[in-house]
């Protein structure tokens, strides 16, 4: 929205700031806070670009929480729960190939591995837990409320065990 000068689908009424600019300006204004929350949904960018974006927060001297991490396991990233179905099979790939459960697990593992490698990132949270009730239609770690696990769920548990996180 910042690059487009918009508030969702409306024209912005005043100059926009990126989240990083906003946090930096809070610090410059002397606002007392401990943690910067960053959302990291799949952004159609290379993972390296996402890492660079996250690393910009390190220079601000605040702990970071990745408050919302997410990607779909089918369809398009922009296919939100409240929109009509998009003919995604006719669309270009967003990241490596069309989204599927294994690619969602790869994205989860990549982002959480980056977060685990940065001591100033104190927490990372996967946003959608169960389909179809999430922000992304297929963004959950479970396929349904009945508890059918996706590859990303198993990958998350494996990482947790590997890193000995409680």
Model-inferred region functions:
Residues 1-88:
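Noncatalytic carbohydrate-binding groove/subsite architecture in carbohydrate-active enzymes
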Residues 49-63, 72-166:
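Aromatic-rich peripheral "rim/lid" segments of glycoside hydrolase catalytic domains that contact
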């Amino acid at each position: 929205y910042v690059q487009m000068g918009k508030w969702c689908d409306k024209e912005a009424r005043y100059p926009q700031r990126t989240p990083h600019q906003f946090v930096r300006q809070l610090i410059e204004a002397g606002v007392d806070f401990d943690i910067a929350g960053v959302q990291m949904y799949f952004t159609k960018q290379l993972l390296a670009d996402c890492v660079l974006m996250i690393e910009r927060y390190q220079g601000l001297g605040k702990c970071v929480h990745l408050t919302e991490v997410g990607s779909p396991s089918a369809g398009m990233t922009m296919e939100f729960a409240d929109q009509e179905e998009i003919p995604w099979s006719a669309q270009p790939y967003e990241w490596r190939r069309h989204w599927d459960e294994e690619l969602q697990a790869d994205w989860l593992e990549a982002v959480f591995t980056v977060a685990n490698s940065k001591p100033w990132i104190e927490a990372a949270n996967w946003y959608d837990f169960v389909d179809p009730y999430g922000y992304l239609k297929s963004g959950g770690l479970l396929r349904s409320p009945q508890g059918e696990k996706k590859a990303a769920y198993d990958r998350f548990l494996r990482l947790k065990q590997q890193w000995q996180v409680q």
